[in-house]
């Protein structure tokens, strides 16, 4: 039907159309407002949740208000308000913005991101890097591709809180997560107060091991003057690294050093280090020796160094393995002069023991380098190696190396491991064949070969066990000749020699025990008992042991002396011992609500061994009786360990003369510890001049005897934490016999959340040192 046009009809229809459109928009908005979740577009969509969602412009824009959460997997974004652009996959967030994108933790007042590329910007933004515990903030932050950020007016710190103890302010900072932070026009602030500036600075922003400068070490030493050390750590790969040390000492000069570590697998590891010093303070008389001016030694060399290291591993892909220790030093004073420096003896010794479980020689002993390759089969092993022992004072103005009487060794060993000869018999064989070329610059040198088979027979008796052992030792020497001087060991035994020495031993052992049950001490697994501990049983064991060992007297004075085993001393001894062991069964309640449990463990609070013996050879001794009379009854021996509670341990080793001469040797120690307050350890050791007379009286002649001066050594170590962030340390070691102090060391440490400050004063030998150490945990420069 046709309707003629009229103004009134047109206005009416236009009004109806507008009302219909408004009604439609109102209905759409109302529907959106009723929703609280939507999913974004794309292959990896996000889920948007909020208290209120509103669609605008036909769904092109979605506004979210209240508890906004945008989430995809482990990535998320939280805010008070969000505006999401559906066609471009961009989102604008505002108000208490918190986000995680990959490894990045972000905070901002407002931000805008491309959800596809994860790029964007932040206003008043910050990121937190968990690995080094680093905060980076800026007025304007651009998030670039990957894990890179560009900060304007940046602030970098590892400290929690609004006013950090230290921070770095920069006009611009470029940060890459698990990479580096590059700062330009930087200022170091202490409590937000500027201290010192730098035009450019690079920091690691890594969550893994990173290359970079380590914290410096500085202080003052009366021997070396003011010192300053800056190490640089270089990561080679996940299993290897290098550390370069630059140490300057005002009295000694510049000492560079390098340390290499490798640990590719559990049984394949290496640690090597080398320090070098061009020292202008050489001296040609002992009066110029600042370390020890009473030993008669000098040092005329300017090039000083120390090479040390250890290694274990496999030779290629074969079944052959190797092991070596390196320890070679330029002079007798190097280790003592720099023992407490960052690359000194104490640091190297601890590092090697932690990595290999092996120790260096004491600082004042000869240096020993040795190594060998070996192959281990089921019952057979072959090894070939070397051993070099260095006397550090030789050369550089002292006794020349041509006068060195120390034995250097190239050994070959064949081992036959312990095993039964016949399955039907319990008889077991253990054998060793060894051969070595023994070299010394001055004195007898030559080939030493030894065969040492040994048989053992375990015997089960009623209520006891017995072990019988017997062996022979056949040794051959083929040595050079030199003029014999009886008091000089290195001149003895030229030509072809041999010796044959049998040995045997018998050991009788039994055990008796008794158990006391304490059911009344049982702890129920309840909330009231959580953390409580109780003894619920005791077992006492007594282990008597009687041993007899025999090695006949054999004249070996015509043989060379390359090692201590070239003088096997005669021995015919009986020893009786009783070992008491108290074992406690302990119950402890642990767990959380609804899952309490009672655990059981065992420990030995008391262990006590007492023993004495009789030396048959000593009873018949005719040599040196004018020097020291016969004493066949061996010292009464006692060794006691007490660990009744977790916070207390005591131990004592005691030797008492059976001839009324009192204590000949003792070692006593105690430790009290508390996880909150600290600990105290004390040890006391004594030695009588003749405490080891039984061995010394069997030497070839008087010149071979070594009796030590009486000693009484007291060591105290205290650690005290009056507050959780302050620690005090004190250690002292004194020889009570001579009144001489060997060491005094005091240190105080302040441990803040984002820095550690440690100061120490140490007096050791002739060196008084003062040191300040600043540590920034998790952060290197």
Q: Model-found features: residue ranges?
A:
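N-terminal secretory signal peptides that target proteins for export/translocation
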Residues: 1-12
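Alpha-helical interface/anchor segments and their boundary "cap" residues
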Residues: 2, 29-30
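Post-signal-peptide, soluble extracytosolic/periplasmic N-terminal scaffold domains
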Residues: 31-145, 230, 234, 342-347
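Short, surface-exposed coil-to-beta transition loops
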Residues: 49, 78, 169, 741-744
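Outer-membrane beta-barrel proteins and related beta-barrel translocases across Gram-negative bacteria
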Residues: 104, 110-120, 127-150, 154-156, ...
């Amino acid at each position: 039907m046709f309707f003629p046009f009229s103004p009134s009809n047109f206005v009416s229809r236009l009004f109806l159309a507008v009302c219909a459109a408004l009604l439609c928009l109102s209905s759409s908005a109302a529907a959106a407002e009723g929703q609280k979740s939507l999913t974004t577009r794309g292959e990896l969509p996000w889920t948007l949740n909020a208290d209120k969602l509103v669609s605008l412009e036909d769904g092109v824009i979605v506004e979210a208000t209240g508890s906004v959460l945008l989430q995809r997997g482990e990535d998320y974004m939280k805010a008070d308000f969000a505006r999401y652009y559906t066609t471009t996959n961009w989102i604008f967030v505002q108000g208490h913005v918190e986000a995680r994108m990959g490894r990045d933790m972000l905070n901002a007042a407002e931000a805008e991101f491309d959800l596809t590329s994860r790029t964007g910007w932040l206003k008043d933004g910050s990121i937190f890097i968990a690995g080094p515990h680093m905060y980076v903030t800026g007025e304007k932050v651009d998030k670039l591709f990957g894990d890179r950020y560009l900060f304007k007016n940046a602030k970098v710190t590892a400290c929690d809180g609004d006013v950090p103890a230290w921070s770095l302010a920069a006009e611009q900072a470029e940060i890459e997560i698990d990479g580096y932070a590059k700062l330009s026009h930087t200022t170091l602030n202490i409590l937000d107060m500027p201290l010192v500036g730098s035009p450019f600075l690079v920091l690691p922003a890594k969550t893994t091991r990173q290359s970079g400068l380590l914290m410096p070490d500085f202080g003052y030493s009366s021997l070396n003057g003011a010192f300053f050390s800056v190490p640089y750590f270089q990561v080679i790969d996940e299993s290897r690294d290098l550390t370069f040390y630059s140490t300057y000492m005002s009295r000694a000069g510049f000492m560079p050093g390098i340390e290499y570590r490798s640990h590719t697998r559990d049984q394949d590891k290496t640690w090597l280090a080398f320090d070098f010093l061009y020292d202008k303070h050489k001296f040609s008389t002992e009066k110029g020796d600042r370390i020890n001016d009473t030993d008669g030694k000098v040092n005329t060399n300017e090039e000083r160094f120390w090479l040390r290291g250890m290694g274990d591993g496999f030779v290629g892909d074969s079944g052959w393995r190797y092991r070596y220790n390196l320890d070679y030093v330029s002079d007798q004073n190097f280790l003592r002069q720099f023992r407490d420096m960052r690359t000194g003896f104490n640091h190297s010794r601890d590092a090697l023991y932690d990595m290999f479980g092996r120790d260096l020689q004491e600082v004042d002993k000869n240096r020993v380098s040795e190594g060998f390759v070996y192959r281990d089969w089921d019952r057979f092993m072959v090894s070939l190696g070397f051993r070099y022992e260095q006397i550090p004072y030789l050369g550089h103005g002292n006794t020349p190396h041509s006068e060195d009487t120390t034995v250097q060794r190239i050994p070959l060993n064949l081992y036959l491991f312990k095993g039964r000869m016949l399955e039907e018999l319990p008889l077991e064989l253990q054998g060793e064949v060894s051969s070595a070329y023994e070299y010394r610059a001055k004195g007898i040198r030559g080939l030493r070969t030894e065969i040492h088979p040994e048989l053992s027979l375990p015997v089960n008796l009623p209520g006891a066990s017995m072990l019988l052992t017997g062996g022979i030792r056949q040794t051959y020497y083929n040595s050079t000749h030199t003029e014999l001087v009886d008091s000089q060991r290195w001149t003895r035994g030229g030509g072809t020699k041999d010796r044959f020495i049998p040995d045997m031993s018998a050991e009788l052992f039994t055990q008796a025990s008794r158990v006391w049950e304490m059911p009344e001490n049982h702890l129920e697994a309840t909330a009231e008992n959580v953390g409580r501990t109780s003894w619920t049983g005791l077992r006492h064991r007594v282990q008597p042991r009687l041993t007899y060992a025999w090695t006949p007297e054999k004249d070996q004075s015509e043989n060379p002396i390359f090692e201590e085993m070239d003088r096997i001393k005669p021995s015919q001894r009986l020893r009786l011992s009783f070992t008491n062991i108290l074992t406690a069964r302990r119950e402890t309640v642990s767990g959380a609500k609804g899952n309490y449990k009672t655990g059981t463990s065992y420990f030995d609070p008391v262990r006590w061994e007492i023993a004495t013996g009789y030396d048959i050879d000593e009873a018949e001794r005719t040599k040196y009786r004018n020097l020291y009379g016969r004493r066949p009854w061996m010292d009464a021996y006692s060794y006691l360990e007490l660990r009744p509670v977790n916070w207390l341990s005591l131990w004592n080793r005691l030797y008492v003369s059976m001839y009324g001469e009192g204590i000949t040797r003792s070692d006593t120690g105690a430790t009290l510890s508390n996880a909150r307050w600290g600990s105290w350890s004390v040890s006391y050791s004594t030695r009588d001049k003749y405490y080891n007379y039984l061995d010394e009286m069997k030497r070839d002649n008087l010149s071979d005897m070594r009796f030590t001066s009486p000693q009484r050594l007291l060591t105290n170590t205290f650690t005290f934490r009056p507050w959780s962030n302050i620690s005090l340390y004190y250690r002292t070691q004194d020889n009570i016999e001579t009144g001489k102090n060997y060491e005094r060391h005091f240190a105080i440490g302040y441990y803040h959340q984002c820095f550690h400050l440690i100061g120490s004063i140490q007096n050791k030998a002739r060196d008084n040192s003062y040191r300040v150490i600043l540590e920034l945990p998790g952060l290197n420069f």
